[in-house]
Amino acid sequence: MKKIIVTVFLCTLSTLIFSQENKNTEISKLVINSFQKNEYQKIIESFDQTMKTALPVEKLNQVWDDLNLKCGRFQKISAITVDKIQNYDVTYILCHFEKMNLKMKTVFNEKNQIAGLFFIPENQK
């Protein structure tokens, strides 16, 4: 009986963890789609308060324009990975641009709000 309870607990726990990762992955995909459509307000809605202050609509627009100037036009996303760094959940989405590939690193706080958003070289973590 004890083994059954432990097994059920572990299955439930893994389902909750997977659900959390899946939600963060979906939010990260929404960010990329919103960048492509110049819908920066949708991105900001997923930010925590610090990010809302640091990256208003104008700065997000500038970030995306600069990326497209330096890296070429955005083409597609491919590999998606997830990680846990201290108390933060992190998703990495490989973004393919015309001239190079970058990873979009999205850091989530415990409330599933974006607490960090970075475009980094594809081999960096």
Q: What is the role of each PLM region?
A:
Residues 4-19:
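Sec-dependent N-terminal signal peptides
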Residues 26, 41-86:
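Short solvent-exposed beta->alpha transition segments
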Residues 16-33:
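Short, low-complexity N-terminal intrinsically disordered segments enriched in polar/charged residues
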Residues 79-125:
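Exposed beta-sheet edge and beta->alpha loop/turn motif
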